[in-house]
Amino acid sequence: MLLWIVATLLIFSLPVSTALDYNDFSLQRIARAPHPSSALLVPYPRVGKRSNILNNNSESQNSVQKRLYMARVGKRAFFYTPRIGK
């Protein structure tokens, strides 16, 4: 009985670790990265990537929930998304 109580306390006292999505880059993690942020972020939407109205319904849930980051330079706002596959 004492063993169950100790095991339960250990399990609930550990910090909650969430599985990070491959697309998930927190801004703090990007800021602390040793390489330039351009290695992690690319402009969104990508240049040359054309949207097809017929294919919009077939997008995967992962791409729909993709995180976007905004950088404001003067009056212009730039959106970035994590780089994948490089």
From Swiss-Prot:
It comes from the Eukaryota. Residues 1-19 form the signal peptide. GO terms for molecular function: G protein-coupled receptor binding. Keywords: Neuropeptide, Signal. Transmembrane segments: none annotated. One of its GO terms (biological process) is neuropeptide signaling pathway. Expressed in two pairs of neurons in the anterior part of the nervous system (at protein level). Encodes at least three neuropeptides: two of the periviscerokinin family (APHPSSALLVPYPRV-amide and LYMARV-amide) and one pyrokinin (AFFYTPRI-amide). This is Neuropeptide precursor capa-1. The lineage of its organism: Eukaryota, Metazoa, Ecdysozoa, Nematoda, Chromadorea.
